[in-house]
Amino acid sequence: MPLHQFQPHPGRNSSLTFAFASLVIHSLFRTDPSDWSKNNTSSYLDLSPLYGYNQVTQDQVRDKAQGKGLLYPDTFSEERLGFVPPAASALLVILSRNHNVRSQNFQIS
């Protein structure tokens, strides 16, 4: 078989399935480093890897100077993603860009 010939996954999964699963896991589980029996996240799937899980991390990704609800370009809040497949970070960049496009559309309407 040639090196670049497409071969579908036997279970018909996209490789992005696993990247999205990593984002879901990182949204739902943030163990407290001082007490491993505590989870420091909310019970919501809230895209905290993109937007931040507290005010300090939210302020690091939001461009408040413009006052338009934008995020800094191609940024996300989650520092733990260095240990997951790069596709998870790529998905967050796509979601960040989509957020900014939608924020700018709200400004126009």
Pin down the residues of each PLM region.
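N-terminal accessory/cap region of cofactor-dependent oxidoreductases and related radical enzymes
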Residues: 1-106
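Structured binding elements
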Residues: 109
